[in-house]
């Protein structure tokens, strides 16, 4: 009798599940057929009940789409599993030769570990470490070791005209201030040139200030650089009527790092010639001075919450070292090998059926299916060593990151944790939510061929609200 009762109870639960799934299917189908956005564009959706272990809904889930930044889900989950949550990015200072009477008779080395969070304060610590080592002058070379990666500073399929935007820096194992400068322009007295402040301070870039304060006839304020010629002259022109800020990338991040390091050393009273800067591989026998360490979680948080491309590419390059062949001069191809191996062995998908060429989703050559992205979300959920860090780093609806301005009301508020994605023609969302019945749900939504991302985001938010109502 007890066995029969158990079977009946199971059948009752299963019937309830099927009923809820049918209701969800009907509601989503109705939304897809009625939304005017989908008359001129496409959408693909896949939804999975992690608690019940069942797929709830799919629509074009096996078709290939450009993922935009939800590809960072692939990079982040792979990095947490392969590198581990205790991994650290390292920038190391060392020397060879001897220090006699304050003079380093040898070379000073900075070995880059692709730390995307290395800022001006970190460089100040490098300068202090040199001084504390008793070095007042260098008779040899000031060496930047960027041997971690090859010389290709942009990914395959990146748009050349995205430069000089900050979201597309020139990649290097030595990155200072994310390869960018922060510019602040303020009005001065009427008719006078605006006040321009640029950080970090360096002699690597120049300023051409042609702005005029409080003078509308001067035209719209423009802040740019001579990027078409790979120049690093910051050009400010037009009318300055209020405080304006902009962040621009600089050409050749490794040179920006080393030139600024040399500049700061000299500013602190050390004697170092700019002509002594070289880019070589540091020998294993150098004497250690200092190491700047960055936890992987700090990099993951910016990659996911802020959808930061540099952070994702830094993770991608570190994964490339796990290619099993070599740990230096890492190429995008080396990184793709590791991504593909993990996809096959851990996720259970054939990498030959997809195309992933970078770590950030910037490339227009990336093609994945929604079901593939869902498989990474589900894998993370099943592995506690990956999930908690990954989940904590995702944007929270209405609260922070790229979801701060979305889903600020309703049941989705503070419930949805998901990675957003936006490139021209693409808007995507992938993550987790908890339905009213307490079940944890994973989902992926990709809108393709959309001219106005705002309309796609509105549809995605509606879908999230529908999923939360699942009972």
Language model regions located:
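Conserved serine DD-peptidase/penicillin-binding transpeptidase domain
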Residues: 34, 82-351, 469-470
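Short Pro/Gly-enriched beta-strand edge/turn motifs at strand-loop
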Residues: 27-29, 203-212, 410-417
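Small-residue-rich helix-loop
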Residues: 56-58, 306, 316-471
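Short active-site loop at a secondary-structure junction
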Residues: 58-78, 82
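Beta-lactamase-like hydrolase cores
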Residues: 20-64, 124, 129-133
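Bacterial Sec-dependent N-terminal signal peptides
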Residues: 1-23
């Amino acid at each position: 009798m007890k066995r029969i009762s158990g079977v009946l109870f199971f059948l009752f639960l299963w019937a309830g599940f099927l009923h809820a799934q049918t209701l969800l299917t009907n509601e989503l189908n109705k939304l897809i057929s009625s939304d005017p956005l989908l008359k001129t564009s496409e959408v693909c959706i896949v939804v999975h009940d992690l608690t019940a272990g069942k797929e709830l809904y799919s629509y074009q889930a096996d078709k290939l789409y450009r993922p935009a930044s939800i590809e960072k889900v692939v990079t982040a989950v792979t990095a947490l599993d392969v590198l581990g949550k205790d991994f650290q990015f390292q920038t190391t200072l060392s020397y060879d030769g001897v220090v006699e009477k304050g003079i380093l008779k040898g070379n000073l080395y900075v070995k880059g570990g692709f730390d995307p969070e290395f800022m001006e304060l970190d460089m100040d610590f490098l300068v202090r470490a040199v001084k504390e080592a008793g070095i007042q002058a260098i008779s040899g070379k000031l060496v930047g070791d960027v041997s971690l990666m090859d010389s290709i500073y942009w990914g395959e399929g990146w748009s050349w005209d995205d430069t000089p935007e900050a979201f597309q820096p020139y990649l290097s194992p030595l990155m200072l201030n994310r390869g960018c400068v922060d510019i602040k322009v303020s009005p001065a007295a009427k008719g006078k040139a605006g006040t321009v402040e640029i950080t970090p301070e360096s002699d690597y870039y120049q300023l051409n200030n042609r702005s005029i304060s409080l003078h509308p006839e001067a035209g719209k304020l423009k802040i740019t650089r001579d990027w078409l010629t790979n120049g690093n002259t910051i050009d400010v022109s037009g009318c300055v009527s209020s405080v304006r800020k902009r962040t621009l990338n600089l050409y050749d991040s490794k040179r920006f790092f080393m030139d600024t390091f040399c500049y700061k050393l000299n500013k602190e009273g050390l004697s170092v010639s700019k002509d002594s800067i070289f880019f070589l591989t540091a020998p294993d026998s150098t004497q250690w001075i200092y190491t700047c360490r960055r936890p992987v979680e700090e990099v993951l948080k910016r990659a996911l919450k802020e959808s930061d491309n540099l952070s994702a590419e830094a993770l991608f390059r570190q994964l490339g070292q796990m290619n099993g062949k070599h740990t230096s001069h890492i190429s995008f191809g080396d990184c793709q090998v590791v991504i593909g191996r993990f996809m096959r062995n851990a996720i259970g998908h054939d990498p030959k059926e997809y195309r992933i060429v970078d770590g950030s989703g910037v490339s227009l050559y990336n093609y994945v299916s929604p079901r593939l992205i869902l498989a990474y979300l589900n894998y993370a959920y099943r592995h506690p060593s990956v999930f908690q860090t990954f989940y904590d780093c995702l944007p929270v609806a209405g609260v922070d990151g790229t979801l701060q301005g979305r889903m600020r009301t309703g049941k989705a508020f503070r419930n949805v944790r998901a990675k957003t994605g936006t490139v021209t023609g693409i808007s995507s969302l992938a993550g987790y939510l908890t339905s009213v019945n307490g079940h944890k749900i994973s989902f992926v939504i990709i809108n393709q061929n959309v001219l106005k991302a705002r309309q796609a985001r509105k549809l995605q938010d509606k879908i999230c609200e529908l999923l939360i109502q699942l009972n």
